[in-house]
Amino acid sequence: MTISPPERGEKAKPIYDQPVDRDHVPADFEKFEQPGFFSKSLAKGPNSTTWIWNLHADAHDFDTHIGDLEETSRKIFSAHFGHLAIVFIWMSGAFFHGARFSNYSGWLADPTHVKASAQVVWPIVGQEIMNADMGAGFNGIQITSGIFQMWRAWGITSETELMALATGALIMAALVLHGGIFHYHKAAPKLEWFKKIESMLQHHQIGLFGLGSLGWTGHLIHVANPTNALLDAIDAGTPMVLDGKTIATAADIPLPHELYNADLVGQIYPGLASGVGNFFSANWWAFSDFLTNNGGVNPVTGALWSTDVAHHHLAWAVFLMFGGHVYRSRFGIGHSMKEIMGNVKGDPLLFPAPNGHKGLFEFLSNSWHAQLAVNLACIGSGSIVVAHHMYSLPPYPYLATDYPTVLGLFTHHMWIGGLMICGAAAHAGIAVIRDYDVSVHVDNVLDRMFKARDAIISHLNWVCMFLGFHSFGLYIHNDSMRALGRSQDMFSDSAIQLQPVLAQWIQSLWASSIGTSAVVGTTTGLPGAVSDVFNGSVVAVGGKVALMAIPLGTADLMIHHIHAFTIHVTCLILLKGVLFARSSRLVPDKANLGFRFSCDGPGRGGTCQVSSWDHVFLGLFWMYNSLSMVIFYFSWKMQSDVWGTVNSDGSVTHLVSGNFAQSAITVNGWFRDFLWAQSSQVLTSYGTGLSGYGLLFLGGHFVWAFSLMFLFSGRGYWQELFESIIWAHNKLKLAPTIQPRALSITQGRAVGVTHFLFGGIVTTWAFFHARLLGLG
């Protein structure tokens, strides 16, 4: 990638004096009438069907349009605004559905019995059968996105407020869309502005995350938490009294602007009426009623204490605003990222690199692909952490007892995380090919990584084989023993035990921390379990289990090692695609061939499907396999050992009567007692409100099977078939002007993996929803 030089004779000016170019590119709507305007070859129009595939492949590959880093940066920056506009429009749609087509008020009045719905099917060809009874006289489609629970946590009490939010989100969409146009056509930032790393860190940490978190804290303290306190009191059967008026329903709750009255809100949280003098006099304990550290969950809602959540956001705001001030920008004080990274030495044992991290700052600040790879890996990992917090630390009221929603949110965040991590590998591969300069990186950690790639990959390969043979071997053994009627020789909790002692020890550590002074500033320590899933007690809401201890046994240890196997294979494939992106013994000149290429020309047989893109392609399959095992395990484990109803004597009746420990230790058990037994709801859904999922289940299977046609067949077969058909058309003088051509190997694989993932996701979606919605 080239960097635009300054104009000849022009003296470099400080970036703060002139950070943008005015009227950089005039808005030209005629370009949109010419598909492929960004490429000379594509702009000529199609002469074969390959043109449409190349158009899709290159439309957003800004690197190849001009090859200028400044122009690419401007396009990406402008596209960010467009992305935000789409997000705001999507949010507006959600708010609008909540305002016009939902039973939000009915759910808010009785969240333990009324089911959430924000969509009603119109009776056109009989599909109104899908409008099931949600309770309180409302019929619609049950939603499992968790937005009702989230809105309740925000302090939203009516559809009127949702309509206001829908309108506001549309206004924001218009504003950011205008911002994208403005910052590309009217005031385009210069490359130096994009490369001001310290200023960017300050803007993100202080402005976006720090002040954003502080602003959200303000909303929680002044609006959401007082509203939730009133709603909690109503749900607990002990409504509060404000100014002599009993707050018996959500309609009685004061409006947000009324809660700014200190005398009124002081009746809910006295600390809010004490004034800011306590803040400046450091008497912060006066605020301890609305900024708490309770730990555990609210027994009324089964969710984290809203006052704990406010405290959390306030703490993050302080950390981020302080941390954002430590970087050196225009005043010449503070840390320089270049100096920090340049002074870091490599690991003397694993990667002895004399030049340490020298050159990494330049690489990251000149390669947006490298930055994106790091960010995607971090955010993807964060999404997976969020998935696990949905059930262990449920953040929103009544989320924990809405089992379909918990499963949906877990699955969603796992898949999003997996896709982002695969995206990280993709952009790391592109960065290595397009932005990595071998002459610059000499004996630094990047160089040492590439030189040690054979050792890294061979060790990963050994780990994968060890985990694969041993974990699957345990299952083979158990299936064989059960088939032969020798249950006493199986690995199980009742025969040969393989207890996860380390995990059980960690669980007991969390449980034993209750009452210890583990919290700074407290004398009593943790008043309750951080999360009741770690050897805690049963938290029941509305007669259903919200949280309880999750027991671990032999089945969990066996599946854990299956997870370890599949995740390590995914890591092996993705990492190999990055480390071997520029060259390999088979294809030494990969760097010249680019990120994606089908085959490496005549005379070099066996060199197809070795590009960095092909590794991402394979990694996507293994990512899907890995996460399918994770979400299936989660679904079955929770139904068997956690979710259920709490009886009057305190005992729990689980959804599937605890069959996980005995059935999940054989492959046959997974097929019979999970896939087959739990698919009964979706397979028998016709004629019920779940019939839509029955159709989706079949449709998802068809899309998935359709992908195999692209993945199992060779390009040559299709090209020969096309040529025969073209010959027949020529005979009849019906030949098209655009020549039909078979997909390239890369294009075929792209179509295949897309349908494979889409079909599998839709099938799983229908399977999970029908199962848990069918159980009620």
Curated annotation (Swiss-Prot):
User: What Pfam family is a match for this entry?
Assistant: PsaA_PsaB
Q: Which family does it belong to?
A: Belongs to the PsaA/PsaB family.
Assembly notes: The PsaA/B heterodimer binds the P700 chlorophyll special pair and subsequent electron acceptors. PSI consists of a core antenna complex that captures photons, and an electron transfer chain that converts photonic excitation into a charge separation. The cyanobacterial PSI reaction center is composed of one copy each of PsaA,B,C,D,E,F,I,J,K,L,M and X, and forms trimeric complexes.
Which chain regions cross the lipid bilayer?
Answer: 76-99, 162-185, 201-225, 309-327, 368-391, 407-433, 455-477, 557-575, 615-636, 690-712, 750-770
As for subcellular location, the record says: Cellular thylakoid membrane
The principal location of this protein is: membrane
Q: Which UniProt keywords apply?
A: 4Fe-4S, Chlorophyll, Chromophore, Electron transport, Iron, Iron-sulfur, Magnesium, Membrane, Metal-binding, Oxidoreductase, Photosynthesis, Photosystem I, Thylakoid, Transmembrane, Transmembrane helix, Transport
Annotated residues that bind divinylchlorophyll a' are located at 701
**Catalytic reaction list:** reduced [plastocyanin] + hnu + oxidized [2Fe-2S]-[ferredoxin] = oxidized [plastocyanin] + reduced [2Fe-2S]-[ferredoxin]
* Induction per the UniProt record: Transcription decreases upon iron starvation.
**Enzyme Commission number(s):** 1.97.1.12
The UniProt annotation places divinyl chlorophyll a binding at 709, 717
According to its UniProt record, this protein's enzyme class is oxidoreductase
InterPro entries per UniProt: PSI_PsaA, PSI_PsaA/B, PSI_PsaA/B_CS, PSI_PsaA/B_sf
Query: Which Gene3D superfamilies does the annotation name?
Result: Photosystem I PsaA/PsaB
Q: How does it sit in the membrane?
A: Multi-pass membrane protein
Keyword S-adenosyl-L-methionine, does the record have it? no
Protein name per Swiss-Prot or TrEMBL: Photosystem I P700 chlorophyll a apoprotein A1
Q: Which residues bind [4Fe-4S] cluster?
A: 599, 608
Record keywords: Transmembrane helix included? Answer: yes
The domain of life for this entry's organism is: Bacteria
Molecular function GO terms recorded: 4 iron, 4 sulfur cluster binding; chlorophyll binding; electron transfer activity; magnesium ion binding; oxidoreductase activity
Q: What does this protein do?
A: PsaA and PsaB bind P700, the primary electron donor of photosystem I (PSI), as well as the electron acceptors A0, A1 and FX. PSI is a plastocyanin/cytochrome c6-ferredoxin oxidoreductase, converting photonic excitation into a charge separation, which transfers an electron from the donor P700 chlorophyll pair to the spectroscopically characterized acceptors A0, A1, FX, FA and FB in turn. Oxidized P700 is reduced on the lumenal side of the thylakoid membrane by plastocyanin or cytochrome c6.
Describe cofactor binding as the record notes it: PSI electron transfer chain: 5 divinyl chlorophyll a, 1 divinyl chlorophyll a', 2 phylloquinones and 3 4Fe-4S clusters. PSI core antenna: 90 divinyl chlorophyll a, 22 carotenoids, 3 phospholipids and 1 galactolipid. P700 is a divinyl chlorophyll a/divinyl chlorophyll a' dimer, A0 is one or more chlorophyll divinyl a, A1 is one or both phylloquinones and FX is a shared 4Fe-4S iron-sulfur center.
What's an example GO cellular component term for this entry? plasma membrane-derived thylakoid membrane
